[in-house]
Amino acid sequence: MTQLQTLKSNLNQTRIVSRNSEEINEDEILLKIERFSFTANNVTYGVAGDTIGYWQFFPAIDNPDNSWGCIPVWGFAEVVTSNNKAIEQGERVFGYFPPADYLIVKPIKVSPQSFSDGKEHRQELPPVYNNYVRL
């Protein structure tokens, strides 16, 4: 897994961090992020990161002092591994992602049109950002 991380105290400072991928647990899926947009709106997410909770959506890896974060982006991804009976490998989705190459989510509230990420750290965050549209 590789992430583009931003220093929370100075949005002009970024770094690329990589580590081995995490294991996919029961009911989880691995999404390969294909493309995303990064606009002035995303910079606003960084500026308001602590106030509104944007830094909490996608915790930065290898970040023991919590000084780095992942500014969320909107984009497209493909399901490359699925341990969830309701989601098939090869499906494509649109939603909220970290600026990274992969993301593990735990689909809940699955419908033919969409699902939400049920990962525990995202449950207190605004639900609209936890929703993924199935394409």
Give the label of every model feature segment.
Residues L11, V43-Y45, I61-D65, K109-V110, ...:
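Residue-level detector of solvent-exposed, low-hydrophobicity positions
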Residues M1-K8:
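Short, Gly/Pro- and small/polar-rich lid/capping loops
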Residues G46, W55, N130-V133:
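Compositionally biased, intrinsically disordered low-complexity regions enriched in proline and serine
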Residues I24-F36, D50-I104, K109:
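Glycine-rich beta-strand-centered segment in the early N-terminal region that forms part
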